Structure formats: C-alpha cells, structure tokens
C-alpha cells in the first residue's frame, strides 16, 4: 500500500539531488523515506543508502519500489530518527523529508559530521524550526522556495495550475553549490 503522505515531486527531487552533491562511496540517509523515491534516486550515486521511516507500511512500500527499480544498496530501517542511526556509520549526506523530531535530527546529523543535509518542508513551522536549528549550530547555508505549476487544457488553450510550495533548507559543513 502506497504511503498516505505525498511523494517528493520530480522537479523538487532534481533540486534536492543537486544540492546534496552525493559522492561515490558515500553513505546517504533518507530520513522519513515515505515511498522511497528519494532513496531510489540517490542509490546509483552512493555506496549505501539508509531509508528510514517510523511507519511499517512506508518501509514495506519503499522496499517494494526499490526492488522493482533494482536498487540493491538500500538498507531499510524502521524506527525513529535520530536514535535509529545510533551505532551505524554516519551518513555523509542526508535528506530529511519528515518533520518529526526535526531539531534533534539536524543536531544529531551535525554532531556526526554529516557534510550536507537538505530538509524538505511544506509547513512554515517546520521551515522556521529547521532554519533556526541550523543557524544555532552554525551550519545553515541557504533556503529555497520551489513552486511548480503544471499546464492543463482550458477552453482550447493552456493554463497553469500551481502546486503547493516546498521549502528546502540546506545545511552542513560543506559549502553549497
């Protein structure tokens, strides 16, 4: 069963991957992996992916999608971040797609030396918390607002229907490109 939360839009995913600047041989964490879309997209560019979600149905769906895509370097971890990362090699890059424990997750990633993290926010409160946490830790790099509008036919012509905006907060020790 597909997770109830929305999947990362392709256009947003393209920007996320560019901002992450994934490295061959690295470890990438997808926290709040949902459908697994970001994990699957990142898998060809890194040695190992941690696909993390607290919802068993999301892990099951993401595992199924990864299998269909032939992504074999994804390790699925059911549980809460940041605790689920304890005792594992630290990820060099991370995408945070869920807002639960956002400040603790950002702080834990920063403490383990994650070089770059991208937080996806649809709620303004999550945006504010992510930015303020990164600023407090001295790792804030930039924020982006991405809004995609898709064309639709209307009365023999074309109109654009805007989607909801997505905020990306980028942080870490590595400078942004």
Predicted feature residues:
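A short, conserved alpha-helix within the catalytic core of class I
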Residues: 101-109
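Conserved SAM-binding motif I beta-strand of class I
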Residues: 48-53
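C-terminal substrate-binding/active-site "lid" region of AdoMet-derived donor-dependent transferases
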Residues: 110, 114-163
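Class I SAM-dependent transferase core
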Residues: 1-24, 29, 61-64
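S-adenosyl-L-methionine
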Residues: 54-89, 93
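Conserved S-adenosyl-L-methionine
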Residues: 32
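Conserved SAM-binding loop of SAM-dependent methyltransferases across substrates and taxa
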Residues: 35-46
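Core SAM-dependent methyltransferase catalytic element
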Residues: 157-177
